[in-house]
Amino acid sequence: HGRDNEAKQEVARFVESVGLTPIILHEQASGGKTIIEKIEHYADEVGFALVLYTACDHGRGIHETKVHPKQRARQNVVFEHGYLMAKLDRGNVCALVKGEIETPNDISGVVYVALDAAGAWKTEVAKELKASGYSLKEFF
C-alpha cells in the first residue's frame, strides 16, 4: 500500500468482513527487520495478497518532456507487488487500483481490480479469493 490510509482501512475492513485476518505491514512489529524482511516473513504465513495502487507519486519517462506526469503508485508498492507474485504465484495476488493510476505495462496476466466507490471491487476480490481456495463469509 501507499499513503492512502482510507483505502487501506476500507480494504482491511472488507477482508475482516469475509472472515479473514488482514496483515498490514506497518501495523506489525518490526523486530529490527527492514520492510522487505517483514514482507518475506509475512509472505511465508499467507496464501494470498492484496496490493493497493493509489495515487501517491507522479512520473513520466525522462524523454517525455511534453507529456504531463501521470499518477503512480509508490515505487516500493510496484516492487512489493512483483515480489509477492513471485513468492505466492501470480494467481494469489490481486492489485486494487484506486483512480486513474499508471500501472506497470510489461507484466502480463496481472489481475488489476478498480477500487471503485460503489464497492463492486469487493465482489471481484471475493471471486479471486475463492479461486485461490478461500471460504468466505457472505458480505452483502
Predicted regions and their residues:
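Short beta-strand/turn micro-motifs composed of small residues
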Residues: 1, 53, 95-97
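Conserved N-terminal substructure of TIR/SEFIR domains
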Residues: 1-49, 87, 138-140
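Short acidic/His/Gly/Ser-rich catalytic and metal-binding motifs that mark active-site loops
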Residues: 8, 57-63, 103-106
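Conserved beta-strand termini and adjacent loop/short-helix elements that scaffold enzyme active sites
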Residues: 25-27, 96-98, 115
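TIR-domain catalytic/interaction hotspot
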Residues: 27-78, 83-86
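Nucleic-acid nuclease catalytic cores
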Residues: 89-103
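C-terminal interaction surface of TIR/SEFIR-family domains
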Residues: 103-140
